[in-house]
A protein has these predicted regions:
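Structural beta-sheet core signal
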Residues: 183, 207-209, 242, 287, ...
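Active-site adenylate/phosphate-handling loop in enzymes that bind or generate adenylated species
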Residues: 128-133, 166, 171-178, 245, ...
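A short alpha-helix-loop-beta-strand transition element characteristic
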Residues: 333-341
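RNA-binding accessory domains that recognize and position tRNA/RNA substrates
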Residues: 1-182, 192-238, 307, 355-360, ...
Length: 392
């Protein structure tokens, strides 16, 4: 019995003349995600991509699991391929759904007939197939409001399809269709979530991280690399830039007022990030900041940080509570890694009493008391690049 995976488009189905480019991007992302599971043929029609396995014994459960994490997909399911003939549809429905229906107590039938030339209308398909299933599985009863199993028949242009499970997709837009951005990836909970959220809007992310040995450990860097690797499940391949930051932090400590340590550090991080971002054709920076969460994330502090940037700074977590961010972190499997007790450079030389409402002129005066430009250039030149590929 021939089986395929049906992938239903999300909001990209509403796109206009450029809808085709979104579809092509989604198919490209799907192909890369399942390339080591076997050979597949991918076709698209009527806001659906059909994943047709060309090899025998392909693990379609693994296909569904991987594809379900790809942005741009509203729903997906495994489905049995039938001829556009009701006798074939009903016979294969009984056989294909035997295990599911044998364990259920209630069911209903839904029919979607996009091919209006098909002889039977949707209500007729539901009634006829429902009767056959009741005859074959007499323990079942019909429940149209809250069934355990919903048997769906889709009659399309080339074939009919039968399935009983509709899995919610990741939603959003295909990664890559909205351009590139650079994620400031720390070892905390928020920044991986921010990267995931912007990837959901179709942005292909790169990541940048700052290390300050001996104040930060190799294990802290490994933790961030693990987070980056986890994000590839959703974001695809990620270019990871590791910036040496020790000299800059020591210069801040030795030459700037303590109350401005954190805000000046953030401004210099942004300066380095945007220089690398511009070289890599990234259109924006991404951070995990949330208003009022810590001293460096007040409105005044963020305004001072943004003043150092020439490109937009995207903050998808800006209006979220910590509990909301943690909920997403658990969902995408970054939370347990994020809470490992290895501190990053943001905790180095933390002031006892940071300025929570800094004035830009005061911050700029404090920063300009020392010429950081040679250290910035050196940090950019010594930045190391590592590529994290999706290779599950």
């Amino acid at each position: 019995m021939k089986e395929v995976v049906l992938v239903k488009f999300g909001e990209m189905a509403l796109k206009g003349l450029n809808k085709r480019s979104f579809e092509d991007m989604l198919k490209k992302n799907i192909k890369r995600r399942i390339k080591n599971l076997g050979k597949f043929e991918l076709t698209s029609a009527q806001s659906t991509t059909y994943i047709n396995p060309l090899d025998e014994n392909v693990d379609l459960e693994e296909v569904v699991d991987r594809v379900g994490k790809i942005f741009g997909i509203a729903a997906l399911c495994r489905a049995c391929v039938c001829e556009k003939d009701f006798s074939d549809i009903s016979a294969k429905a009984v056989e294909y759904l035997e295990d599911v229906l044998s364990c259920a107590k209630t069911f209903k039938v839904n029919a979607k007939r996009s091919d209006k030339a098909f002889a039977m209308k949707s209500p007729e398909i539901c009634a006829e197939l429902g009767g056959i299933l009741l005859e074959k599985f007499p323990h079942l009863t019909v429940d149209v409001k809250n069934p355990e199993v919903t048997v769906t028949v889709e009659v399309r242009d080339t074939n009919a399809y039968v399935h009983a499970e509709n899995i919610r997709g990741a939603g959003g837009l295909p990664v890559g269709c909205s351009g590139k951005a650079m994620l400031l990836l720390s070892g905390g909970i928020d920044s991986p979530v921010a990267g995931w959220m912007m990837a959901k809007r179709g942005i292909h992310i790169s990541a940048i991280h700052y290390v300050s040995p001996p104040y930060t450990s190799d294990r802290a860097l490994m933790k961030v690399e693990q987070l980056c690797d986890k994000l590839t499940d959703y974001c695809g391949d990620i270019a990871f830039f590791c910036v040496p930051f020790t000299e800059i932090q020591e210069a801040i400590k030795d030459n700037c007022p303590e109350e401005f340590f954190t805000i000046i550090m953030r401004r210099l991080m942004m300066e380095i990030a945007q220089r690398i971002a511009e070289k890599k054709n990234c259109l924006a920076l991404i951070t995990g900041e949330s208003v009022g969460q810590v001293a460096s994330q007040t409105m005044a502090a963020m305004a001072c940080t943004d003043a150092a940037c020439r490109i937009p700074v995207l903050r998808p977590c800006v209006g979220m509570d910590k509990t909301e961010i943690i909920e997403i972190a658990r969902k995408i499997d970054t939370f347990e890694t994020s809470i490992e007790p290895y501190e990053d450079c943001c905790t180095v030389f933390t002031p006892k009493h940071p300025k929570v409402r800094p004035r830009l002129e005061d911050v700029e005066k404090a920063q300009n008391s020392f010429d950081f430009e040679p250290l910035i250039q050196k940090a950019v030149e010594e930045t190391e690049l590592k590529i994290f590929e999706y290779n599950k």
